[in-house]
Amino acid sequence: MAEQVTKSVLFVCLGNICRSPIAEAVFRKLVTDQNVSDNWVIDSSAVSDWNVGRSPDPRAVSCLRHHGINTAHKARQITKEDFATFDYILCMDESNLRDLNRKGNQVKNCRAKIELLGSYDPQKQLIIEDPYYGNDSDFEAVYQQCVRCCRAFLEKVR
């Protein structure tokens, strides 16, 4: 039997309390359900340092629980080491992408492929909008988009 290679993905948004923790939790469930979780290192982080150490937004936690998913994530800011250790850094919008490309260019041994998670959306919704100032239906929309994108991403890279 061929040895499985471990892959790694880091989901990133502005504050790491809404979109990226949802994406991380969705992807964890997908790889667990497909019995490939041992092949993956999965995390999420923020571009900013605003929420370091905080739990995800209660609306994000509620949305995930509604779908039978739990998360114990605590927000953290992306580090230079992340660019050198993760295979994929998947972000939510163009502002994240600009910030990550700028930071990644400052890391000599950047190996991460930095992309928009929405680039994997079969419905072609490139941007995953921040639901922070929205309501429960906005969080549900983020969840559904993350499910579509994470499924397509996993299919492409496995």
From Swiss-Prot:
Enzyme class: hydrolase
Active-site residues annotated for this sequence: C13 (nucleophile), R19, D130 (proton donor)
Positions carrying N-acetylalanine: A2
Keyword annotations of the record: Acetylation, Cytoplasm, Hydrolase, Phosphoprotein, Protein phosphatase
Any one GO cellular component localisation term in the record: cytoplasm
First-listed, main subcellular location of the protein, grouped into a coarse class: cytoplasm
InterPro entries for the chain: LMW_PTPase, Ptyr_pPase, Ptyr_pPase_sf, Tyr_Pase_low_mol_wt_mml, Tyr_phospatase_low_mol_wt
PANTHER family found in the cross-reference section: LOW MOLECULAR WEIGHT PHOSPHOTYROSINE PROTEIN PHOSPHATASE, LOW MOLECULAR WEIGHT PROTEIN TYROSINE PHOSPHATASE
UniProt-recorded Gene Ontology molecular function terms: acid phosphatase activity; non-membrane spanning protein tyrosine phosphatase activity; protein tyrosine phosphatase activity
Family assignment from sequence similarity: Belongs to the low molecular weight phosphotyrosine protein phosphatase family.
Identification of the protein by name: Low molecular weight phosphotyrosine protein phosphatase
Record's subcellular location: Cytoplasm
Catalytic reactions of this protein: O-phospho-L-tyrosyl-[protein] + H2O = L-tyrosyl-[protein] + phosphate; a phosphate monoester + H2O = an alcohol + phosphate
Post-translational modification: Phosphorylated by LCK. Phosphorylation at Tyr-132 increases its phosphatase activity.
Regulation: Inhibited by sulfhydryl reagents.
Keyword NAD attributed: no
Pfam families (alphabetical): LMWPc
Subunit structure, as described in the record: Interacts with EPHA2; dephosphorylates EPHA2. Interacts with EPHB1. Interacts with the SH3 domain of SPTAN1.
Keyword Phosphoprotein tagged: yes
EC number of the protein: 3.1.3.48, 3.1.3.2
Function description: Acts on tyrosine phosphorylated proteins, low-MW aryl phosphates and natural and synthetic acyl phosphates with differences in substrate specificity between isoform 1 and isoform 2.
Modified residues (Phosphotyrosine): Y132, Y133
